[in-house]
């Protein structure tokens, strides 16, 4: 069959992404030659995360075409979150459609979603990734492909700006990332939702429309719809009407540029963190703690024997860096210790570095505090040690 322009674009995008995760290195030599070749039963496996929607069905169809041409097995994993009536049937239909396309193995997993403080959307996402990672490990897949499009990227940028700020909010979703030891990739970030819809039409692939997307709702979506659905249905179209051009493409390109900046800042911050921050588990040695160099918090520095993570940050080392790097080092170090600090708390710790005039420490979540002693900032639980 003759491929449409959008289908050729998708094939190229998937092939380029597989190259990015070094899948081309495992291509069987005979698949570089013209002719019909059977994919070996023990060939490397790629899984497509499939919800049954238009984006993931388009990705499943295109990935099967590309993987087959490379001598790589292409399977699918469908996660049933159990949050909607009839979700089991939707998952089963998605699995059958993937099998009809030739994908195999096709894995259906049931997720347990437990919403806590982070909300239902975040809990469902965490549960989904848990199941995707488990499926990849159990099947031996070398990568899991996700069907996020350019439109999803634009929505992610807007959601990021609503919930946070700075270059991290603008950076959107990475094309390739690792989670719990599993490689994930997003081949369709350069394609629009209209193009994935068209690809399904080109290939005669049926798909399911999630009612929580609100596509059938006239007017503004109520607040009980997921935030992403409201951004997609209401906010993005309103911005496009105001701007008079395709803002999804604009936001997606901005995300690509911001991600390059973010990756450099993260790399540089990691280098500085390795030199400036020491992380230790309690209980530590009872040896005296130097106030000039970062090292373990001593057991005598705490009022109890509880186990936790302490940080020692070298003021002399971190003070030489620009503010953008200092703030990142502090944030990453706190995150490593399991402390989810606010932007205001991170900025207050930075003032202990660059605007030190004997001020008190900074109270942090989980009973942690950050206090400066000479040329070291100590981040420990209980905080009493810092005043000795």
Swiss-Prot record:
Primary subcellular site in the record, as a coarse category: cytoplasm
EC number: 6.3.4.19
Role summary: Ligates lysine onto the cytidine present at position 34 of the AUA codon-specific tRNA(Ile) that contains the anticodon CAU, in an ATP-dependent manner. Cytidine is converted to lysidine, thus changing the amino acid specificity of the tRNA from methionine to isoleucine.
Domain characteristics, as noted in the entry: The N-terminal region contains the highly conserved SGGXDS motif, predicted to be a P-loop motif involved in ATP binding.
UniProt record similarity statement: Belongs to the tRNA(Ile)-lysidine synthase family.
GO molecular function annotations of the record: ATP binding; tRNA(Ile)-lysidine synthase activity
Known catalytic reactions: cytidine(34) in tRNA(Ile2) + L-lysine + ATP = lysidine(34) in tRNA(Ile2) + AMP + diphosphate + H(+)
UniProt entry tagged with the keyword tRNA processing: yes
NCBIfam families in the record: lysidine_TilS_N
Protein name: tRNA(Ile)-lysidine synthase
The organism's place on the tree of life at top rank: Bacteria
SUPFAM superfamilies: Adenine nucleotide alpha hydrolases-like, MesJ substrate recognition domain-like
Binding positions for ATP per the UniProt entry: 51-56
Intracellular or extracellular location(s): Cytoplasm
Disulfide partners: none
GO cellular component terms listed in the entry, alphabetical order: cytoplasm
